[in-house]
Amino acid sequence: MHKSNSTYFSDMDISRTHLFTAIIRNGIRKHSRLYGAKKNAVAGAVGATEGTRGKHYIALGGISCLFKKEILPYKKYEMWTRLLCWDNKWFYLVTHLVKPGVGQPKSWALQPWKKSKPAKDVDPEKLKGAIYATAIAKYVIKRGGITVPPETALIDADMVPAKPEGWVYQEAATEEHESNGDVLPKAVDAKDWNWDVIEAERLRGLKVAEHFAAMDGMHDFFDGGKEGVLGEFADLLY
């Protein structure tokens, strides 16, 4: 016996909702009438295009999960969720279900009162060995029928700074090549996260997310049975 695979998805929904609302919380707050925003200011909430009508909502566009190890009954586990990247429409979030205690956060941005253990290098293989499952999901913000671009929403939520006028991404200035050919952003402090660093990290995650996005092409494989089928099988006897 083990934890039902179907329950992973409802658990991860909770984790992703916590993270995503935390990411855009300032955009929600600054335009909410509950926090003193005037009625005419509410119309421009969370990066919406001026003149559009309709309420904002967040929609899940798809999810894929890779199961690595079973979780035995009553076994504790942790969910670690992060924003992987974004493109012109979608936010891509990754969630790991892992053995408790394997992760040691360097800091707690929204909970500064929590104590952090001294930073130390952790064996990547040990981290991978602690993973039960990993999932990727994509979310979109809509205002009525209009898509709110992720970058616009992040700027509106004060999560990233506005791009400098005339800014162009310079790969060599922000990335370093490891001996195995991997390209990784250089380690930086939070205060150093300018658009060069942000874009380097976004593109690193997008290399994985693009494969997930390509799965939209699977819709094209439905042919309505034009070449014949094995049969029709109902789950009820009528």
What are these regions, as identified by a protein language model?
Residues 71-76, 82-238:
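HotDog/MaoC-like acyl-thioester-processing domains
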Residues 15-18, 100:
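Short hydrophobic alpha-helical module
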Residues 1-8:
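A conserved, well-ordered hydrophobic junction motif at loop->secondary-structure transitions
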Residues 17-77, 83:
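Hydrophobic beta-strand-centered segment that forms part of the acyl-chain substrate-binding groove
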